[in-house]
A protein has these predicted regions:
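Active-site-adjacent mobile loop/cap segments within catalytic or ligand-binding domains
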Residues: 153-155, 159-162, 202-261
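Active-site histidine-acidic residue metal-binding/catalytic motifs
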Residues: 39-142
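Bacterial N-terminal signal peptides
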Residues: 15-24
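Solvent-exposed loop/turn segments at secondary-structure junctions
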Residues: 67-70, 132-136, 158-163, 175-178, ...
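Bacterial N-terminal signal peptides that target proteins for export
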Residues: 4-13
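Sec-dependent signal peptide cleavage junction
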Residues: 23-37
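A short, glycine/acidic-enriched catalytic loop
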Residues: 73-102, 160-193
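Structural recognition of the beta-strand scaffold that forms the well-ordered cores
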Residues: 60-64, 125-130, 151-156, 169-171, ...
Length: 261
């Protein structure tokens, strides 16, 4: 009797073991089939967790015009300077006694609009993201972009430091090898602009809010396209020739990235 019970117990254990092995095999096959993406293949880093949480992809690329309209500090006052600007970059005055200034937001919007127009002309499903209030800035900008879940998120900015600073550079998230690859490609694409020198790409160490919150299914890159604190460089980055060159070369490179993903 005891021997019979032991035999039945062994059979039950064997069946349970087989069941566990089958379930494990099914889970592995599912993961391999639906979540097997490489950086080179798809320009994104996908995991089971992030894929299940990410919304449906609504566009291929989001181009964000950095900052929001009227943001304090993102401007250069030009009261005592002679500045040559195109008609679409206004001299603003808030009536606060500080005088006339050029807003970074206006420069960013000009470049972003030109880039989106060229991407769409090349058949890329690109969206333009412009912020008009503080509620759409920093981390909020990243959360807004996440709703569209693009392959690529490119945020266009211009830098401010001192009157002699010069150059453009790109930024990517730390430990994001694909982000670095895209950042380098975009920087190299505009290296021959003849007006603003290229600097090395830099890793975001956590202080750039919009990059911190972007979905892991999206590759985020931020471009600082020149220093508007330098009057000479301000004139260059606002010029139609610079904007057209940069937007054309970026559009070509982004199109190549998307179509060969």
């Amino acid at each position: 009797m005891i021997r019979l019970l032991l035999t039945k117990f062994k059979n039950i254990l064997l069946l349970l073991l087989i069941g566990v092995m089958v379930l494990t095999s099914m889970h592995t096959s599912y993961a391999d089939e639906y979540f097997k993406y490489t950086v080179e293949q798809d320009y994104i880093n996908i995991s089971v967790e992030t894929m299940s949480q990410a919304p449906q992809r609504q566009c291929e690329v989001i181009i964000r015009a950095g900052e929001y309209q009227g943001k304090a500090g993102k401007r250069i006052y030009v009261n005592n300077a002679t500045v040559k600007l195109p008609d679409d970059i206004p001299l603003r005055n808030d009536g606060d006694g500080k005088g006339f200034y050029v807003s970074e937001w206006d420069i960013n919007v000009k470049e972003a609009k030109a880039l989106v127009e060229k991407l769409q002309a090349r058949g890329i499903n690109a969206k333009l993201q412009i912020a008009y209030s503080k509620s759409e800035d920093l981390n909020a900008a990243g959360r807004i972009a996440n709703k569209s879940n693009p392959y690529l998120y490119v945020s266009l900015h211009h830098n401010y430091y001192d009157a002699n600073s010069t150059g453009y550079f790109s930024m990517y998230n730390q430990n994001d090898t694909q982000g670095k690859a895209v950042a380098d490609r975009l920087s190299n694409a505009i290296a021959n602009n003849g007006q603003v020198p290229m600097r090395d790409s830099r890793a975001n160490d956590g202080y750039i809010g919009e990059l911190n919150v972007i979905n892991k299914t999206t590759t985020p890159v931020l471009l600082e396209l020149g220093f508007f604190s330098n009057i000479s460089e301000l004139e260059k980055i606002c010029s139609d020739s610079y904007v057209q060159y940069v937007s054309t070369q970026l559009a070509n490179e982004i199109t190549s990235i998307i179509k060969n993903k």
